[in-house]
Swiss-Prot record:
Record key words, sorted: Gamma-carboxyglutamic acid, Hydroxylation, Pyrrolidone carboxylic acid, Secreted, Signal, Toxin
Protein name from the UniProt record: Conotoxin Fr3.1
Coarse class of the protein's main subcellular location: secreted
Biological source species: Conus frigidus
Keyword Secreted appears in the UniProt entry: yes
GO molecular function: ion channel inhibitor activity; toxin activity
Modified positions (Pyrrolidone carboxylic acid) in chain numbering: 52
Phylogenetic placement of the source organism: Eukaryota, Metazoa, Spiralia, Lophotrochozoa, Mollusca
TM ranges: none
Leader peptide range in chain numbering: 1-20
Modification 4-carboxyglutamate, positions: 54
Length: 69
């Protein structure tokens, strides 16, 4: 019984704690990558993403459309 308790403690508590990474690492990495971009490049990327949105039919548009209503 004691052996199973020790095994459960190791695998359910200690092992996940040892393998966890900082939650803020990916965010910091993305921020560092975007700091190198100049403002014009960021605007271009944003405009490209907005152009890729689907247009809706004006007959059934609910106001959530980007360009079509």
């Amino acid at each position: 019984m004691l052996k199973t308790g020790v095994l459960l403690l190791i695998f359910l508590v200690l092992f996940p704690l040892a393998t966890l990474q900082d939650a803020d690492q990916p965010v910091e990495r993305n921020v560092e990558n975007k700091q190198d971009l100049n403002l014009d490049k960021r605007r271009g990327m944003k405009l490209l993403a907005q152009r890729q949105q689907e247009c809706c039919d004006p007959d059934w548009c609910d106001g959530a459309c980007y360009n079509c209503c």
